[in-house]
Each structure stands twice: as C-alpha cells, then as structure tokens.
Amino acid sequence: MDIKLVNIGFGNIVAANRIVAIVSPESAPIKRIIQEAREKGILIDATYGRRTRAVIIADSAHVILSAVQPETVANRLSSKDVNEES
C-alpha cells in the first residue's frame, strides 16, 4: 500500500488520500465546522500560532487548520498526482 503525503506547512504532513476538502476559513459555515470540531476534540491545529488560511477536512471527519493558502495545498496535492503518472 502506497501512501501519498502532502506538506501542509511547517513540516506538517497529511495523507493525501484522506483529504475530502480544502477550504478557506472565512465563511460562517466553515467557522461553525471548526468550532464544532474543537468541541468534539477532532480539530488538529497545524498553524504554529499563525493565522489560519486553509481548513482541510479529512474523511475521518477530522478538521485540520493550516497556515498555508488553500491554493498552495491544492497545488502540492496535484503535483503529487503528476509525479505519480511519470
């Protein structure tokens, strides 16, 4: 079994096959998702105290906060797919 990993900033890595969505944290529904995850204990804060710029939702319902832009995470994810095909 080959696990693909994606760097989400500051040396933090997430399994690419577990990512369901990468979204911006500005909207009210996403803020609610973050708060509910915090209350349930399924929030992973990988921002190192910096501003949250991307919210990654995993298939296990875990919510991961990243200080890297959503576009950057998506580009890293898609570049992994390109490297696999070569």
UniProtKB/Swiss-Prot annotation:
Matches recorded under InterPro entries: RemA-like (IPR007169)
Pfam families: RemA-like (PF04025)
Family: Belongs to the RemA family.
NCBIfam families with a match to the protein in the record: MtxBflmRegRemA (NF046064), PRK04323.1 (NF003315)
Name of the protein described by the UniProt record: Putative regulatory protein Swol_1238
UniProt source species: Syntrophomonas wolfei subsp. wolfei (strain DSM 2245B / Goettingen)
